[in-house]
Amino acid sequence: MSQEFNECLKRYKLPEFDAAWGEIHRGIEKESLRVSADGHISLSSHPQALGSSLTNPFITTDFSESLLEFITPVYSDIDECMKTMEDIHRFTLQNLENDEMLWVASMPCPLDASEDIPIAQYGSSNVGKLKTLYRHGLSNRYGRLMQIISGIHYNFSMPESFWQPYADSCGFKGDLKDFKTEKYLHLIRNFHRYSWLLIYLFGASPAACKCFATDREHGLEQLDDYTLYMPDATCLRMGNLGYKSEAQKSLFVCYNDLDSYVDCLREAMNTPYPEYEAMGQSIDGEYLQLNTNLLQLENEFYSTIRPKRVVKSGQRPSEALTQDGIEYIEVRALDLNPYLPFGIDSEQIHFLDSFLLHCLLSESPECHKQEFFEVAGNLANVVEHGRDPELSLNLEGEPKKMRNWGSEILAEVDNAASLLDHIHGSTNYSSSLAAQSTKIADPDLTPSGRILKDMKEGGLSFFEFSVQQSRKHRDDLQDNGLSEATVKMMAETAAQSLKDQADIESLDTEGFDEYLKNWNDA
């Protein structure tokens, strides 16, 4: 354990920090493909009973009309957060037609052709058209298949009551906004160093439908006539078949300070990329993408974690960060766990909080370019070979056995877990960490290990396994588990969102061509 972290633990057991530890803020965003009863992608429009995908705060769509995204509010109570996610699932399943299901896996269901994937529609307003055009740009740049891979986004922040005592204990005398930003970047750098461990512990995509790799280079093996896999893989979603952009490969995004991070993104958003220029912004008056730059907008940059801030109307994310600093971080490295009805559970959240707190409070030197690519190499190795007991990673240019390193990190995270248990008067955090330690000792206990074991023992293809789990969760959740008050609230929220979308559409005063030009010039 680092000396800095040891000193932190002593300081943070003081009474002035007690309230802060109990008020850690988190929220969950969960993507799920909407599929037919037989496990194929739904081609129908977003159900009206779920409201407007533009304005419903709980239920929206991601890339596709068929790719639902469920969003919880921010909670300091883990059980309340999970209960809301459960309510959203139950309400959604009760309002899907023709026995449609939510696909439990991160890797998609079988597809006859990627062109069949319906791109998300957000209505006739300029902001709605912009969102749809952005997705057309993603489709034209990367293909639609990559865009319907699903995952969990975990949003994490420390409460306001934490920051002033923390700044005082560090001897910081400046603007608290700058201190918070500095420490969130501190967390992000450490997260990048150790995120391979989350991929090992929670990766749940060791296999994919064979059709997913059609006309794509890959090093996967054939498990059966319909399934490709890698024997020791953990998370193909984060590998060459998953979220990957050759155009972004050379981007060195610096998290040493906020200005460098924002400057890198802005440069990418203002630098024409030859391949996208050749494609053109439009053909015969039909738009193909927002612009021809390396990034159409900030969110196109693929990363396992992002610094975030709630934006004001009409504000760019990079502008919000520059003006007001980092408000929270968004972890984007998590697969859907097909054994869990909501893709994540409270045990995993307890561990994530301990892990992220460790990243925040431990020493975090600035990251240089050599380390940046070393970290990327470690992640790639764990994605493809994480359950190989002999796998070694690189630490400052030297090989280190992954299992040994993982055990060392968990031993340090245990200190954060013990602190949180001390404050909460519980054993939940230490228990969640103990559950992860067993996975280090036995790779078959990881989600990826369990999935391959169950597929092989059951003689199941990836498709058959995923359909089986999807049906199980659908049937369990369709049972009446919603209170009348919750049903009423969800239905009223959906209805209000449709009115809100109509109001937005009625307020537009300029044509989309002018709107897009002004947006690109901003």
Residue ranges and their predicted role:
Residues 322-323, 329-421:
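Substrate-recognition/cap regions that form aromatic- and gly/pro-loop-enriched pockets
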Residues 108-110, 208-212, 372-382, 429-439:
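A glycine-rich phosphate-binding loop feature that marks nucleotide/adenosyl-phosphate handling sites
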Residues 43-46, 82, 115-116, 166-167, ...:
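Short conserved micro-motifs at the rims of enzyme active sites and ligand-binding pockets
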Residues 1-139, 146-150, 179-189, 193-196:
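Terminal catalytic/cofactor-binding subdomain
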Residues 123, 129-140, 148, 157-321, ...:
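Loop-rich catalytic cores of soluble enzymes, especially ATP-dependent carboxylate-amine ligases
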Residues 27, 83, 87, 129, ...:
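Generic recognition of stable, solvent-exposed alpha-helical segments in well-folded globular domains
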Residues 31, 146-159, 328-335:
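Histidine-centered divalent-metal-coordination microenvironment in nucleic-acid enzymes
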Residues 426-522:
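Extended, compositionally biased alpha-helical segments that mediate assembly or anchoring
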